[in-house]
Amino acid sequence: MPVIWGGGHFGLDWFFVDWKTDVPEMEFAHINVKELMTVLIAAFKWAPCWVGRHIVVRSDNSATVSAINKSTSRSQDLLPIVKELFWLCVKFDFKLTAIFIPGKLNILADHLSRFHSVDSVFEAKSFLLPSVFDVLYCKFHMSYNTFHLLQSVWEPICVP
């Protein structure tokens, strides 16, 4: 099954991406590219908060973990993303490492990557209470198109 969503969190802040809606050119990209691109999105979003810190990425994708820890990749598809991560680390003075954690144990990130599912929204609620159900708050964590695409799924559980 192709990976069509991604997500990440830092503290209580989070994001969700629908590759087809938000980044159409990534819709058919390899899973390794999407997994590493999710880390890059997180770095762009939170790098200013990471100044002087050691950030540990938890991923269930071994290619992502390896590329981050080695700061390189043999994959020509991953290498530009790794380089961009490297320059963000330099620009914002943070250290980035990664550890492998099976998706079932990386609970919040796993639920965020499946945020289209009502069950995953309810599971994420336990980590992000109460604001995950505030419609206005949700709009800040995903694109306009993705928000409206998912709104029909959320309608029974979101509070206006």
What is the predicted function of each stretch?
Residues 1-3:
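Two-metal-ion RNase H-like nuclease active-site motif
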Residues 25-27, 86-90, 128-132:
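Short C-terminal domain-edge/linker segments immediately following a structured domain
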